C-alpha cells in the first residue's frame, strides 16, 4: 500500500514528537511504502511564514511568488498581519484553515504559489492508496480549537473525498482541562472519523472519550507506537557521559566534564501545561528552582540533571544556571536522550513520551499534571499501584511529597524497575500489532 504520512513531527525539537513519529513510521512502513510526508512544522500552531488573505484573488499569489526577494518580504508581512490581529490571527481572514473544509482546501490551493513550503499539503500530487495520521496529542478539543487538529482533519476529509483510505493511529482524544469542551469541532470531525478505516487510540481514557463523543467509528486501542522501541532502549549501547552525544545547543565546554551517567542520577523535566498554569516565566523559573534545590538537598549522593524535552521546557535553561545544574539539551540525539532517561534512578516530569522513554528502561516516574489526561493514563497503562499526579507548579508541601515518593520508588530498586520494564515489553508487542491493520 502507498501511504501519505501526516504528522511526521521529527522536525520539531520535542523528544516525544521525534521519537513516536519515527516509531509509528517504522510500524506502518514495514509492509507499505510511504510516498509522501506532511511534517508537523506546517500543521502546528504557527509557521511564521504563511501569506494568505481571504479576499485576494488567485493571481495575486502567483504574481508575488515571482518577486526575487519574496521569501524575505513574506515574513515581514506575516508579522505585520499578526500585529494587526493582536491574538486573533488564526481562523481569521489571514488563515487558510476554516471550519468549512471544502473552503479550506480551495484556500490552500489558491495560495500555494506564494507559499511553496505548504506544497506537501497538496494531496493531488501523490500517487497513494491511504492517508495515515499520527494522532499524538493533536486532537485535544479545546476552545478555541487547536489549529493542528483542524489542518489534519482537513487532510483526512480531502483524502476521503479523493476516495482514499484513511487511518487515524497513535492518537489521544481529550478535552482541554483549561478551556471549554468544543462540541462544534467534534461534530465537524465525527463524519470524517466515521468514514475512516480505523480510529486507533493509545490509552483507555481516549478510548472512553471516543465512545462517548463519536458515533459509528471503527475504534481500536493500541499502546503508543513508542513502546515499539523496547529493543533499541535495551540494547548494549551505553551512554556514560555527554561528550559524544550532546546536540549543538548543548555542546558547551562543560558538556565534556559535567555529565557523568555512570553514577546514580535523577532527571527532572517540566510539564506540557506549565505555560498555561503560570502567570509568568519568572514564576515558573522560581518554582522549578526551588524543586531542583530541594531534590539536590534530599539526594546529595546522586547527580541531578535537567532534561529540556520540549520547546515549552526552555525555562529549564534558566533554572540550570541559577542552580548550577547540568542540562541535557533539546537537540540531543533522540536515542541517546532516551538511554539517559531509561537509566535514571527516577524521573520527575509532567511529560508523556519522555516518561515512556524512561519506562522502557525500567525508570520509575514521579508525575506532575499535564495539558490532558495523559500523565494519569500512562500510569494506568504501566499498571502503577498508585495513580498520583502532583501540581505542575508544586508548592513546598507538594515538593516534599514528590521527594518522598521519589525516595520510595528508588528504594524499591530492581523489583520495581523489572516490573515496569516487563510491562513495557508487553506493550511493545501489543503496539507492533498495528502492522496488521493494513492487511484487513
Predicted feature locations:
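Active-site anion-handling motifs in enzyme catalytic cores
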Residues: 1-440
Amino acid at each position: 500500500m502507498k501511504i501519505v504520512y501526516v504528522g511526521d513531527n521529527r522536525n520539531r525539537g520535542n523528544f516525544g514528537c521525534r521519537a513516536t513519529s519515527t516509531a509509528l513510521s517504522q510500524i506502518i512502513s514495514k509492509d507499505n511504502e510511504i510516498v509522501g510526508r506532511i511534517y508537523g512544522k506546517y500543521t502546528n500552531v504557527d509557521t511564521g511564514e504563511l501569506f494568505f488573505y481571504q479576499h485576494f484573488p488567485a493571481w495575486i499569489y502567483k504574481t508575488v511568488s515571482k518577486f526575487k526577494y519574496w521569501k524575505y518580504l513574506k515574513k515581514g508581512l506575516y508579522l505585520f498581519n499578526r500585529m494587526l490581529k493582536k491574538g486573533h490571527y488564526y481562523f481569521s481572514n489571514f488563515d487558510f484553515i476554516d471550519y468549512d473544509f471544502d473552503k479550506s482546501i480551495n484556500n490552500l490551493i489558491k495560495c500555494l504559489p506564494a507559499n511553496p513550503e505548504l506544497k506537501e499539503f497538496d494531496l493531488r500530487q501523490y500517487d497513494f492508496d491511504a492517508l495515515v495520521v499520527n494522532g499524538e496529542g493533536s486532537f485535544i478539543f479545546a476552545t478555541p480549537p487547536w489549529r493542528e487538529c483542524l489542518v489534519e482533519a482537513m487532510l483526512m476529509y480531502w483524502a476521503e473525498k479523493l476516495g482514499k483510505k484513511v487511518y487515524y493511529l497513535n492518537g489521544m482524544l481529550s478535552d482541554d482541562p483549561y478551556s471549554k469542551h468544543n462540541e462544534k469541532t467534534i461534530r465537524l470531525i465525527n463524519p470524517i472519523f466515521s468514514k475512516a478505516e480505523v480510529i486507533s487510540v493509545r490509552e483507555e481514557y481516549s478510548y472512553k472519550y471516543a465512545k462517548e463523543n463519536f458515533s459509528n467509528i471503527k475504534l481500536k486501542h493500541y499502546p503508543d507506537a513508542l513502546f515499539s522501541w523496547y529493543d533499541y532502549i535495551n540494547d548494549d549501547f551505553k551512554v556514560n557521559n555527554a561528550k559524544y552525544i550532546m546536540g549543538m545547543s548543548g555542546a558547551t565546554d562543560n558538556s565534556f566534564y559535567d555529565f557523568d551517567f555512570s553514577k546514580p542520577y535523577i532527571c527532572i523535566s517540566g510539564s506540557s501545561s506549565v505555560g498555561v498554569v503560570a502567570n509568568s516565566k519568572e514564576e515558573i523559573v522560581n518554582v522549578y528552582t526551588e524543586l531542583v534545590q530541594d531534590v539536590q538537598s534530599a539526594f546529595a549522593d546522586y547527580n541531578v540533571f535537567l532534561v529540556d524535552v520540549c520547546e515549552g521546557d526552555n525555562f529549564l535553561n534558566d533554572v540550570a544556571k541559577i542552580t548550577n545544574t547540568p542540562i541535557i539539551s533539546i537537540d540531543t540525539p533522540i536515542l541517546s536522550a532516551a538511554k539517559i532517561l531509561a537509566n535514571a534512578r527516577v524521573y520527575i516530569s509532567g511529560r508523556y513520551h519522555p516518561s515512556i522513554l524512561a519506562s522502557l528502561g525500567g525508570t520509575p516516574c514521579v508525575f506532575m499534571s499535564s495539558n490532558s489526561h495523559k500523565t494519569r493514563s500512562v500510569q494506568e497503562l504501566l499498571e502503577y499501584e498508585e495513580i498520583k499526579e502532583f501540581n505542575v507548579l508544586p508548592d513546598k508541601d507538594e515538593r516534599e511529597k514528590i521527594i518522598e515518593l521519589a525516595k520510595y520508588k528508588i528504594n524499591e530498586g530492581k523489583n520495581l524497575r523489572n516490573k515496569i520494564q516487563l510491562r513495557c515489553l508487553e506493550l511493545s508487542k501489543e503496539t507492533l500489532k498495528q502492522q496488521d491493520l493494513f492487511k484487513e
